[in-house]
Structures are given as C-alpha cells and as structure tokens.
Amino acid sequence: MTLRTITLIAGPTASGKSELALQMAQEKNALIINADSMQVYDVLNILTARPREADTAIVPHYLYGHVSPTLNYSVGQWLCDVEKLLVTFTSRSVIFVGGTGLYFRALLEGISKIPHVPDVVRQKWRLLLNKEGAESLYRQLLQIDAVVAEKISSQDGQRIVRALEVYDATGEKLSWWQKQKTTPLIAPSRAEKILLMRPRALLYERIHKRLDSMIERGVLEEVVAMKKLMLSPSLPVMKAIGIPEFMAYLDGYRSFENALEAAKTQTRRYAKRQMTWFRHQFDEEWMLTS
C-alpha cells in the first residue's frame, strides 16, 4: 500500500500558491486544504482570492468559505476541522496551502491548551487597563509571569491583559500554559514543505494586477454585501484588506482611486510582514522556491 503524501505550500499573498497547489494536486491525485485565515470566511470570495469554481471542479478543495463572517474562527477550530478531514480521507494525499504562518506552525507543532477565560474575568482586567493604564498592569505582570512580560512591550495593553486574565482565571502562568501543547496533527518529517517567495518587485506587480482584476470581477459587490451585515468592526473578517478601504469609498470618505491605492499599499505591507515572518519562523527544512 502506498502511503499518502503530505505537502505544505506557504508564502506571501499573491505569490502563486494556489496555482502551484492545483498543479501539484493533479500530479499527486491529492485534495487541497486551505491554510489561510481569511479564505475560511463566506461572502469574501473575490476579495480573499479564494480558488475559482473552475479550479475546485478539477481538484477537491476544503475549508474555503465554510465559516460565517459573523464568527471569530480560531486556529484551534481550524485544527479541529483539519483533523476531521484527515480522518475522513485516510489514504488520500493532501496539500495544505495558504499564507497564515500560525496555521502551519499549529499543524506541525500543536497549540497551547489554554482554557477559556470567563467573560467576567476578561471584563475585570479590561476595566483595570482603562483605569490604571498598561504600564501599571505591566509591573504586576513582571511579578506574576516575568517570562511572558519580557517578551512583550510595557505599552501592549492587550497582551498584558491576556497574560493577567489567564493567571487570574486558572491560577497558572501563561508561560506555563504555552508549554502545554496538543499533539501535532502532522509530524514535520512526514511533510514536504515548500516556501514560495517571489522577488519583491515581481510580487508587488502581481499584487497590483490582482487587485485590479478583483475590481473587474465585482469585488465591490462583496463589500456592499458585507456592509449590509452591519458586523462589529472587531470581527476578524472586518479587518480583511480591502474591507476598510472600500467601505470608506462606499461611505463617501474616499475616492475610488484613493481606496484602491490604499488597498494596494496595505497588501504590499502585509506581504512584506509575511515574508519577514516566514524567514524568521520557518526552519531550513522548508524548500525555498520562486
């Protein structure tokens, strides 16, 4: 019996990951699983550059557009969905493709088993943050969990509060919980790992062309559909690049040209952050290709 192959394809936005995955999936008779935290959401088909119907008709694609934009979909939920697929398709070769580095890390290393923090505890620490300020709470964190405190800025109120609320709710330091990881779904030695990194000038050109193409394909209709849902700005889907920019255009605060240029600028910045993250976080086992 031939063992199935596991392939991971990571890279910055607009680098051509989906095209490479489709090509390899046909060669390996594999299915494709999404590893991009924005492509999981429904409605934003064009804006998040999900695979087109012509591609999904050729090769089965999973975990694309299966989550309501009203939800906050976590890496833990993604791992649960992945595990179900791996159990269902035990003998089928699989290709994971996407630009969310944390998804790949969780897949290969597991994730910390941090318990749910009750809303009353979370609210307590957020009120204290507003009342006392980040630096005051940071001094408390230094006394409670110096390991975590030394990794974050004394001005980073959100991360300071997160560490304090976990300790308050569980009696254990966040640094302790971070070591209690789930068993990885995939052993790193079992996977072929590909990091697709285009030359920066070429990548930026691809980004610009893709956004122009999105306009032609009707991306503004998706933004209108999102606007009608009247979602909280704090939801992850509302932070997708293009949503704030094009909503500002629809509301009359930006010209169309300005909104499009802003979306291109934000996408370039995002791609640069992705490239930096991949270079620092992925080891030499990832095969670099352009």
Swiss-Prot record:
Keyword terms, alphabetized: ATP-binding, Magnesium, Nucleotide-binding, Transferase, tRNA processing
GO terms of molecular function: ATP binding; tRNA dimethylallyltransferase activity
Keyword Cell division: no
Chain sites annotated for binding ATP: G11, P12, T13, A14, S15, G16, K17, S18
Catalytic activity reported: adenosine(37) in tRNA + dimethylallyl diphosphate = N(6)-dimethylallyladenosine(37) in tRNA + diphosphate
Positions bearing the site annotation: Interaction with substrate tRNA: T100, R122
Residues holding substrate: T13, A14, S15, G16, K17, S18
Region (Interaction with substrate tRNA): 36-39, 158-162
Family statement drawn from the similarity comment of this UniProt entry: Belongs to the IPP transferase family.
Protein name: tRNA dimethylallyltransferase
Organism: Bartonella tribocorum (strain CIP 105476 / IBS 506)
Organismal lineage: Bacteria, Pseudomonadati, Pseudomonadota, Alphaproteobacteria, Hyphomicrobiales
Gene that encodes the chain: miaA
